[in-house]
């Protein structure tokens, strides 16, 4: 299995520019934890925290398979003051 390479930006329905996006690696995607203020992944012993703006986040996952790259868009849903990340990526 490859690694997830995730790109996000905080402007909905807009194409991210180089200044708006950050690229990082995570594995596996089911380790995602999200709150209203931080986005945390535990891909390694060094957990990374990324600031979030609730309701203003678009997250795209790129999964490399050989020479192909599949684009999977994940949605963060605001529920009871906390962001919920669906674990099913289809």
From Swiss-Prot:
Keyword Cell membrane appears in the UniProt entry: no
Membrane topology: Single-pass membrane protein
Segments passing through the bilayer: 55-77
Entry's Gene Ontology cellular component terms: membrane
Key word Zinc present: no
Residues that carry a glycan: 80
Keyword terms, alphabetized: Glycoprotein, Membrane, Transmembrane, Transmembrane helix
Localization in the cell: Membrane
Function: Cluster 41 protein; part of the gene cluster 41 that mediates the biosynthesis of an extracellular and diffusible metabolite that is able to stimulate colony sclerotial production.
Protein name: Cluster 41 protein AFLA_114800
């Amino acid at each position: 299995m490859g690694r997830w390479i995730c790109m996000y930006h905080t402007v909905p329905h807009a194409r991210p520019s180089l200044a708006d996006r950050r690229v990082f690696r995570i594995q596996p995607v089911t380790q995602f934890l999200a709150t209203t203020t931080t986005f945390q992944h535990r891909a390694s012993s060094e957990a990374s925290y990324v600031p979030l703006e609730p309701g203003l986040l678009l997250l795209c996952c790129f999964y490399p398979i050989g020479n192909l790259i599949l684009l999977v868009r994940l949605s963060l849903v605001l529920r009871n003051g906390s962001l919920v990340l669906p674990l099913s990526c289809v």
